[in-house]
Structures are given as C-alpha cells and as structure tokens.
Amino acid sequence: MCPSARSLLLLASLVLLEHLGSARNLPRSTPVPAVSQECHNLSQTLLSTVDSALQNAIEILEYYPCSAEEVNHEDITKNRTNTVKACLPQELAQNENCLASRETSFIIKRSSLTSGRTSWNTTLCFSSIYEDLKMYQLELKAISEKLLMDPKGQIYEDKALLAAVDYLMQAVNVNNETVPQTPSPEAPSSNLYRTKTKLCILLHALRIRAVTINRVMSYLNSS
C-alpha cells in the first residue's frame, strides 16, 4: 500500500529543499505529544528571525554579494548530517516501491515522523536537527567574533538569531548534550569583506534549513 498523499507532500517538500541546498540531522527522543507544540513554535520563531536577520544583512551590506541571486550558496552540513533522511515518515520508508522518483529512492528506510511508536525515530530526527543547528551556531559565533574587529561597525551579531537557534537546540537536545558556547577554533582573519560575504552565505543556508525544520515540526505537531 502506498503512503498517503499528505506524507508524499511532506517528502516532496523536503526533497525540494534538499536540492535547493538544504537538510541534515539532529536529536530528539522524548514523547512527541509533550514537546511537538513547543518545538513547532520555536521552529517558527527561528524561521521568522532568520528572515529578519537576512533582510537586515542584505540592506546593510548592499555593496556585497548578499542577495539570493548574488550569493554563492553553500551548505555547511553537507556530508555531515542529513535531516531529510533522519526525519522521513516511516510509511514512506517502508513503501520504497511506491516512490516514483529516483531522486527520493536514496532516502533512508528507518526514520519516522508519524505518531505512535516513534520514540526511536523521533530521537534520530531531533538529533539530526540538533547537529545541524550546532554547526550553524558555531559558525555564527565565529563570524560574530570577527565582525567585532570591524572599525566601521557596519554589522554585528544578531543576538535574537543566536537566541532563537539556542532555544530550539535546547528543545531538541534529547541526548542532553552540553550546548557549545565557544566558536570553533579558526585562524583570525583581517579580511572583513570575506567575513561579511560569508555571513550572507551562512544566513541564506540557515534560512533554507529553518524552512526544512519548520516543515518537519509542522508535520510532527499535526500527527
């Protein structure tokens, strides 16, 4: 029996985001009904905050390649996590013969966002989301440190964005990992043009990931 149209729509949305430059994995294992609404709300907050931060960067860095048409799109989670695989509904995974496109046939067969017996699969999905956000958090903090060296003070870290990332990380941190507080070690750079360009690239990538996460949480919340 093929999966429902609703599940196929979720899969199509996630795969589309994947090919636009999106999705990887993160943690979660507590009962779905207890946390799905909170995570859904936090994912919506993250998406709106990323949108605001990106728009602000595009306006302030008007002479930099910062728009969607100009930026060199890059996925920092590539080959490290895969949230699409981790969060695939079980009914799709168990009915791979029903998947019409070769583009979807690679998706792992274990993940699930459906209600009921989903604790293990939900843990895998939320783990993937956590790892995604951790990478973006560290990159944002590293860039923020470099922006402090800008004598013009053109643009600084977005505290609201960092807070939104942190809150969602805490909500999906089912493995009780210690949330990193320091940027990843990196050689200092005096090339502020490159740093600001990298900020634009990172914000575009994070927005795509936030859309993916929000759709996953919407599915969980309505299951």
UniProtKB/Swiss-Prot annotation:
UniProt keyword terms in alphabetical order: Cytokine, Disulfide bond, Glycoprotein, Growth factor, Secreted, Signal
Disulfide bonds listed in the record: 66-200, 87-125
GO cellular component: extracellular space
Keyword presence, Zinc: no
Gene Ontology terms describing biological process: immune response
Function summary: Heterodimerizes with IL12B to form the IL-12 cytokine or with EBI3/IL27B to form the IL-35 cytokine. IL-12 is primarily produced by professional antigen-presenting cells (APCs) such as B-cells and dendritic cells (DCs) as well as macrophages and granulocytes and regulates T-cell and natural killer-cell responses, induces the production of interferon-gamma (IFN-gamma), favors the differentiation of T-helper 1 (Th1) cells and is an important link between innate resistance and adaptive immunity.
Endpoints of the signal sequence: 1-23
Family stated for the protein in its record: Belongs to the IL-6 superfamily.
The species this protein was found in: Marmota monax (Woodchuck)
The name this protein goes by in its record: Interleukin-12 subunit alpha
Places the protein is found: Secreted
Main location group: secreted
Record note on quaternary structure: Heterodimer with IL12B; disulfide-linked. This heterodimer is known as interleukin IL-12. Heterodimer with EBI3/IL27B; not disulfide-linked. This heterodimer is known as interleukin IL-35. Interacts with NBR1; this interaction promotes IL-12 secretion.
Positions glycosylated per UniProt: 41, 79, 121, 176
Single GO term (MF): cytokine activity
